[in-house]
């Protein structure tokens, strides 16, 4: 299977570790190229790394709007 690049956006360290572990074990073709724990860090990593897939915590930072706004911006601009 073809390899693909992933950025994981998660602000809870345990959740991030678990997500990375699942990807590593269940989808070995996925390369986690970056992680981010904030919106600002996500956009920085996104611009630098150009992922094929983003796994996004919709409740980032305890807010229900930050993750949704990131999704909207990604859809509209990319």
Which positions does each model-derived feature cover?
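The feature encodes the CheY-like receiver
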Residues: 61-63
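Active-site residues of response regulator receiver
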Residues: 56-59
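Short acidic/histidine-rich motifs immediately flanking catalytic phosphotransfer sites
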Residues: 48-53
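Two-component/phosphorelay signaling modules centered on CheY-like receiver
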Residues: 12-39
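Short alpha-helical segment
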Residues: 40-42, 71
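Non-catalytic signal-transmission and effector/linker regions of two-component phosphorelay proteins
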Residues: 1-7
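Short hydrophobic patches on amphipathic alpha-helices
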Residues: 45-46, 74
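Short amphipathic alpha-helix used as the core "switch/output" element in two-component signaling
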Residues: 65-78
């Amino acid at each position: 299977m073809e390899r693909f690049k992933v950025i994981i956006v998660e602000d809870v360290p345990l959740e991030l570790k678990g997500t990375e572990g699942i990807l590593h074990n269940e989808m070995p073709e996925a390369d986690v190229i970056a992680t981010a724990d904030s919106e600002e860090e996500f956009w920085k990593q996104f611009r630098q790394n150009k992922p094929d897939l983003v796994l996004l915590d919709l409740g980032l930072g305890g807010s229900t709007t930050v993750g949704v706004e990131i999704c909207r911006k990604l859809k509209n601009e990319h």
